[in-house]
């Protein structure tokens, strides 16, 4: 999955699943299954339902993604 093969979208975590997987509802209403990126895991960034996140989706499978950023609460 190269940099040119990803779509970055913003969404909200709606459910925490086992093995660092999360169900994320994107701003357009779609629900995707997303895992935490390695850099977020390495830096111990905690995610809870309700957090706003940025998800990278592959153009080949739009139902799965990678959480790359947790937005700061406002």
UniProtKB/Swiss-Prot annotation:
Gene Ontology molecular function: ribosome binding; rRNA binding; translation initiation factor activity
Subunit structure: Component of the 30S ribosomal translation pre-initiation complex which assembles on the 30S ribosome in the order IF-2 and IF-3, IF-1 and N-formylmethionyl-tRNA(fMet); mRNA recruitment can occur at any time during PIC assembly.
S1-like domain boundaries: 1-72
GO cellular component: cytosol
Cross-referenced PANTHER family: TRANSLATION INITIATION FACTOR IF-1, CHLOROPLASTIC
InterPro entries noted in UniProt: NA-bd_OB-fold, RNA-binding_domain_S1_IF1, S1_domain, TIF_IF1
Pfam families named among the record's database cross-references: eIF-1a (PF01176)
Keywords: Cytoplasm, Initiation factor, Protein biosynthesis, RNA-binding, rRNA-binding
Location in or out of the cell: Cytoplasm
Protein name per the record: Translation initiation factor IF-1
Sequence similarity: Belongs to the IF-1 family.
Function, as annotated: One of the essential components for the initiation of protein synthesis. Stabilizes the binding of IF-2 and IF-3 on the 30S subunit to which N-formylmethionyl-tRNA(fMet) subsequently binds. Helps modulate mRNA selection, yielding the 30S pre-initiation complex (PIC). Upon addition of the 50S ribosomal subunit IF-1, IF-2 and IF-3 are released leaving the mature 70S translation initiation complex.
